[in-house]
Amino acid sequence: MKAAVLTLAVLFLTGSQARHFWQQDEPPQTPWDRVKDLATVYVDVLKDSGRDYVSQFEGSALGKQLNLKLLDNWDSMTSTFSKLREQLGPVTQEFWDNLEKETEGLRQEMSKDLEEVKAKVQPYLDDFQKKWQEEMELYRQKVEPLRAELQEGARQKLHELHEKLSPLGEEMRDRARAHVDALRTHLAPYTDELRQRLAARLEALKENGGARLAEYHAKASEHLSTLSEKAKPALEDLRQGLLPVLESFKVSFLSALEEYTKKLNTQ
């Protein structure tokens, strides 16, 4: 179990290099930057959509009758959560920095393996790209006369044009499939090599580095404990910030319920 957790952590901390394996080099982005970006997008979308729903409810007949002032409470809650996110930012950043530092050696070894395999398969990728561009240019040359013919003709030629294009499309599909199959065949040994290298790294870590693995686990647990302790004040601030909001909602709801009950009794 420890090995599995460590594997996931290391793969994540390598900068998701496997995801970019077939891509060109991109500007480096730290794991914390990726997590922060995803969390920010998710929270912003949730906040905006939630506020829209609250606004729609308050604008309805029932919302106006209850007069719960949900929109004011929603703004207060989102402000409180934004404050919490700002307070936890440095603490979480410190956690990721410590974890990256502890796994630096292992990440460098795995990055080296990825780069070596990438260098071996790059000629096949370049050749595939070149052939694909050639096929697209050949297809364009074959289709161009038909396009000109369509412009000169009328609608009655559409069916005839479709019959002429169908074989070309099938030919293009078959040729593309052949190139993809050839690329897959060329890359298969290197994919297996990369898989075997990764398995060997993890096996060596498990067999010969038991103490090292235990050390990783102990340090990760220590960092998590530190993160938990440092987050307590911010979470307490969140609780204190939400209490007035919840109390205000409770008072507004009970007041609206009492008023509604009185109206029912007078009818």
Swiss-Prot record:
Expressed in which tissues: Major protein of plasma HDL, also found in chylomicrons.
PANTHER family the record matches: APOLIPOPROTEIN (PTHR18976), APOLIPOPROTEIN A-I (PTHR18976:SF11)
Gene: APOA1
Function (record text): Participates in the reverse transport of cholesterol from tissues to the liver for excretion by promoting cholesterol efflux from tissues and by acting as a cofactor for the lecithin cholesterol acyltransferase (LCAT). As part of the SPAP complex, activates spermatozoa motility.
Annotated keywords: Cholesterol metabolism, Glycoprotein, HDL, Lipid metabolism, Lipid transport, Lipoprotein, Oxidation, Palmitate, Repeat, Secreted, Signal, Steroid metabolism, Sterol metabolism, Transport
GO molecular function ontology, one term from the record: heat shock protein binding
Compartments where located: Secreted
Record's comment on post-translational modification: Glycosylated. Palmitoylated.
Protein family membership: Belongs to the apolipoprotein A1/A4/E family.
Subunit structure: Homodimer. Interacts with APOA1BP and CLU. Component of a sperm activating protein complex (SPAP), consisting of APOA1, an immunoglobulin heavy chain, an immunoglobulin light chain and albumin. Interacts with NDRG1. Interacts with SCGB3A2. Interacts with NAXE and YJEFN3.
Protein name, as recorded: Apolipoprotein A-I
